[in-house]
Amino acid sequence: MENTIEVVSNLSSNGLLLKSSIKNENIVLLDMHLDIGDLKDLKNYKRSFLKNIGYNVDVVDYGNKIKFLLDNVRNNKKIRIWSSHKNSNEYMTVFYICNLLEKYDAELYVVYSDEISSEAKSVGELDKEEIKNVDALERKLLKEEIIMYSKTWNSLLNDNSDIRYISFDNTIKSCSYDYLEEKILNELKKYNEVRVGKFISNLKIDCIIDEIDYSEYRHPSGVRFLQYDRRGGQGCGSGRQRH
């Protein structure tokens, strides 16, 4: 693992790797929240909307982390991305890294949590024992795959909608906050009273939504329903719970 740089896209994934034998200095945390918000500022390796989802700064600069990643690629280090086909932010990170490194002759590998356990819809839902033999869990991306994922990233970048999510056909789709809010509010009109967790569960069953994390998807103007979960609702995350 000494010659491997690990790329993770959220704190829970970062925490999992730190519990394993992977050294902290080999981990690059790109918590960019690629599944929401305007992507255009990423050309400068920045995100400028994250205060809306709990960050205490207006702009987060990832320039140093990207420089570290590129320096290691130039030094022929292996790059391993931790991801999931069932988590839009983690899956988007694969597309982003492929686009970033397409012009380099980089060795890119991916570990998908849902290929290790069907219940693990995010890397952070794995247990450290499940990633002991990580070299046996990874798979190398072919050049053709890197090019394909890079094109997917460019397509999503050009579309640049408010939300990017994994649809039921396992592809990344885009939609606006207004579109999603309208669908949710129309569904909400069917109820006189309903618990947040139950309502979200029904939305998923009725294919109104799928794996969208409502604790994060908050309209900049403050969509009322999308804030309920942040104030203590059960949320819509599924998979294995850790206490």
What are these regions (language model features)?
Residues 112-128:
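Short, conserved secondary-structure transition motifs
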Residues 7, 77-88:
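Acidic beta-strand-to-loop metal/phosphate-binding motif
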Residues 198-212:
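Short helix-coil junctions and helix-kink-helix linkers
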Residues 1-58:
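A structured, charge-rich N-terminal accessory region that forms the first stable segment of a protein
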Residues 123-197:
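A conserved mid-domain beta-alpha-beta active-site/ligand-binding segment of alpha/beta enzyme cores
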